[in-house]
């Protein structure tokens, strides 16, 4: 049975931890508001850009002159997985869920006889995947010093990926991230970005509403690299909001659990102190009776 001093020390320790988790929850809440706004503001642009690109792609998809970023290499033998996670922990199952989805996809591809390569963005995913898939790593993007991701950061990642594609390092590229829904819901998502896939929105007829100059093929060749960067940027923003939402939820749970633990320890402390006082009274009474 722990002594009163031990129980008191544990109570103080848990109280100190609760202060930390509460502070982290408040910081995450503030960051979440900014990250959520950024993610939501980017969605209309991304959706409209994808709609226009879908119309262009539909008009030249079967053409022999279609850009390689759209038509592909003619093979899907070598697959590049771009796994986006956070640089910091204490965000519940956020990183684990993304890594789990990427790991399952990699194992599925390997089972089909495909060659898999992995590029990680964020050290938490790298640390989780390197245990069993480390031999597949071809690079890592460190975002530790970046407080708020920008389109320039996405362009840097896209440039590296496109350079690897141009020299024939892979045939298909897929990004893994968490799509933000709300504070308690972030959906691990896999999205192919090379060869480019643009879904035509219902009711959109971009290819018939506009005439393009000089022509669709030339415009696609110019816009497709930007499309890859846009999809990566959108994924980074969704990931940022998801990370802060997951951290806020995790710290809220930790704070409530700490409160419950303090209550239980306080009850145990009071019972132990009561037992000590009772024993002392019994000893005093017994001594008085002996006299």
Swiss-Prot record:
Keyword annotations for this protein? ATP synthesis, Cell inner membrane, Cell membrane, CF(1), Hydrogen ion transport, Ion transport, Membrane, Transport
**Does the record bear Signal in its keywords?**
no
One GO CC term on file: plasma membrane
Matches recorded under PANTHER family: ATP SYNTHASE GAMMA CHAIN, ATP SYNTHASE SUBUNIT GAMMA, MITOCHONDRIAL
Membership in a protein family: Belongs to the ATPase gamma chain family.
Cellular compartment(s): Cell inner membrane
Relate the protein's function as given in its record: Produces ATP from ADP in the presence of a proton gradient across the membrane. The gamma chain is believed to be important in regulating ATPase activity and the flow of protons through the CF(0) complex.
Q: Name one GO molecular function term.
A: ATP binding
Q: What is this protein called?
A: ATP synthase gamma chain
Q: Identify the species of origin.
A: Roseobacter denitrificans (strain ATCC 33942 / OCh 114) (Erythrobacter sp. (strain OCh 114))
């Amino acid at each position: 049975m722990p002594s009163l001093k031990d129980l008191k020390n544990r109570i103080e320790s848990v109280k100190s931890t609760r202060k930390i988790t509460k502070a982290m929850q408040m910081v995450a809440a503030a960051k979440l508001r900014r990250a959520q706004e950024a993610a939501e503001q980017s969605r209309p642009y991304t959706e409209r850009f994808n709609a226009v690109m879908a119309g262009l792609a539909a008009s030249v998809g079967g053409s022999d002159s279609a850009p390689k970023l759209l038509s592909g290499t003619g093979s899907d033998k070598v697959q590049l997985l771009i796994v986006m996670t956070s640089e910091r922990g204490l965000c519940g199952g956020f990183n684990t869920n993304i890594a789990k989805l990427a790991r399952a996809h990699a194992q599925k591809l390997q089972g089909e006889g495909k060659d898999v390569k992995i590029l990680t963005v964020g050290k938490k995913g790298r640390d989780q995947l390197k245990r069993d898939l480390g031999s597949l790593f071809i690079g890592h993007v460190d975002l530790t010093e970046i407080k708020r991701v920008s389109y320039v950061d996405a362009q840097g990642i896209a440039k590296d990926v496109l350079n690897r594609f141009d020299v024939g390092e892979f045939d298909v590229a897929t990004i893994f991230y968490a799509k933000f829904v709300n504070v308690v819901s972030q959906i691990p998502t896999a999205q192919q970005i090379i060869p480019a896939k643009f879904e035509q929105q219902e009711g959109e007829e971009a290819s018939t509403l506009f005439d393009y100059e000089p022509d669709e093929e030339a415009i696609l060749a110019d816009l497709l690299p930007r499309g890859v960067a846009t999809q990566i940027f959108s994924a980074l923003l969704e990931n940022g909001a998801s990370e802060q939402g997951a951290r806020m939820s995790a710290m809220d749970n930790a704070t409530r659990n700490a409160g419950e633990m303090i209550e239980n320890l306080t009850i145990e402390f009071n019972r132990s102190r009561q037992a000590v006082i009772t024993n002392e009274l019994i000893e005093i009474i017994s001594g008085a009776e002996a006299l």
